[in-house]
């Protein structure tokens, strides 16, 4: 796979993707394009100038994505731009015949989601989206236990995710622009994906409550809860913590079925250590983690390289986005929002 990155103006994804791609078997990480954005702004947000980034990964630097794709004969591009520009860039890049990976937030409107799905079909490319917490070892252990029937068909799920705070983003970072979706979409992505994946069901209705309790400089919520009624009658909830300036477990979970409860919970004083456990008729026991799982941010690479079915498609991302937007609408209006089937 011959791959490049389109866009360097971001705090996290250019480095995360660069580290994940560099030296990976079957992958040639060849270039990055600034998309004509101001170099000073890129360095302010990324912490590296475009030239420093190119030197770090020993890649070529371009201004325009089209030149990068053509000159380097790329077959795949990672898109790192403002979320509100994703659809525009997918339509441009799809015409060049490259596959595309879009780090969340996928899009900020239903219309943009449709545009990406249509571009993928029109030009015969593949669009993958991520990351997905389903590939984290504890979540993979939960899924394995569900598939083994250890608790029967689940009917209730509670997920809690602690994601730090907005403090890491500078005041002039475009992430703070409400037009780009904020944590309502970027964090909602994780929990909704897990609800669909672990419950094996679709969402019927959504109710959400968001608030800003500890982040006076932020235009967004910093703590929220999404409650989802599933089509088959079960329920799932997702607590988003973007407010804790303390050490706290990144992930906690309970999923309930007729034969027991599977949980991810804190183990001891170490705030980062959690265990996966089963409470059933035989009592309590810890469940082992899988020896190996796909990387939760880079799983799509092998899927592209090996031509496998994509775990997180553009159409699936469209559905997750619709649920995220419905939750945001619910939080703003105080009403339950029904999802169209």
Model-flagged regions — what are they?
Residues 1-53:
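N-terminal Rossmann-like dinucleotide-binding module
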Residues 9, 133-218, 334:
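Predominantly a Rossmann-like dinucleotide-binding segment in NAD(P)-dependent oxidoreductases
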Residues 26, 76-79, 303-341:
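C-terminal helix-rich "cap/oligomerization" subdomain common to oxidoreductases
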Residues 40-44, 286-298:
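Active-site loop of classical SDR/Rossmann-like NAD(P)-dependent oxidoreductases
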Residues 60-70:
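Short acidic low-complexity segments
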Residues 63, 102, 127-129, 238, ...:
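Hydrophobic residues in well-ordered beta-strands that form the structural core
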Residues 75-76, 82-83, 87-134, 149:
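Beta-strand-loop-alpha-helix segment that lines the small-molecule cofactor/substrate pocket
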Residues 186, 192-269, 297-309:
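Contiguous beta-strand/loop segments that form the cofactor/metal-binding neighborhood of enzyme cores
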């Amino acid at each position: 796979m011959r791959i490049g990155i389109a866009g360097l103006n971001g705090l996290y994804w250019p480095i995360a993707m660069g580290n994940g791609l560099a030296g990976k078997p079957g992958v040639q990480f060849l270039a990055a394009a600034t998309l004509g954005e101001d170099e000073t702004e890129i360095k302010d947000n990324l912490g590296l100038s475009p030239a420093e980034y190119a030197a770090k990964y020993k890649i070529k630097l371009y201004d325009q994505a089209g030149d990068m794709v053509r000159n380097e004969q790329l077959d795949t591009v990672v898109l790192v731009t403002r979320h509100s520009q994703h659809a525009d860039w997918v339509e441009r890049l799809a015409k060049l015949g490259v596959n595309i990976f879009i780090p969340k937030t996928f899009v900020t409107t239903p219309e943009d989601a449709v545009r990406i799905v249509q571009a993928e079909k029109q030009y015969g490319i593949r669009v993958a989206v991520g990351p997905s917490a389903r590939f984290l070892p504890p979540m993979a252990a939960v899924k394995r236990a569900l598939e083994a029937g250890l608790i029967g068909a689940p009917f209730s799920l509670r997920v809690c995710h602690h994601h730090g705070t907005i403090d890491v983003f500078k005041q002039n970072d475009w992430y703070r622009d409400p037009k780009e979706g904020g944590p309502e979409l970027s964090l909602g992505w994780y929990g909704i994906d897990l609800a669909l994946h672990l419950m094996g069901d679709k969402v019927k209705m959504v109710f959400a409550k968001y608030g800003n309790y500890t982040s006076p400089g932020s235009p967004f919520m910093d703590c929220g809860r999404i409650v989802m009624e599933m089509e088959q009658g079960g329920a799932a909830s997702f607590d988003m913590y973007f407010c804790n300036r303390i050490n706290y477990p990144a992930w906690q979970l309970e999923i309930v079925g007729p034969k027991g409860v599977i949980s991810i919970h804190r183990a001891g004083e170490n705030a980062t250590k959690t265990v996966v456990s089963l409470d059933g008729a035989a009592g309590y026991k810890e469940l082992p983690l899988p020896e190996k799982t796909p990387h939760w941010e880079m799983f799509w690479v092998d899927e592209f390289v090996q031509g496998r079915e994509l775990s997180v498609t553009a159409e699936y991302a469209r559905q997750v986005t619709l649920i995220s937007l419905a939750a945001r609408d619910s939080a703003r209006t105080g009403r339950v929002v029904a999802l169209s089937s």
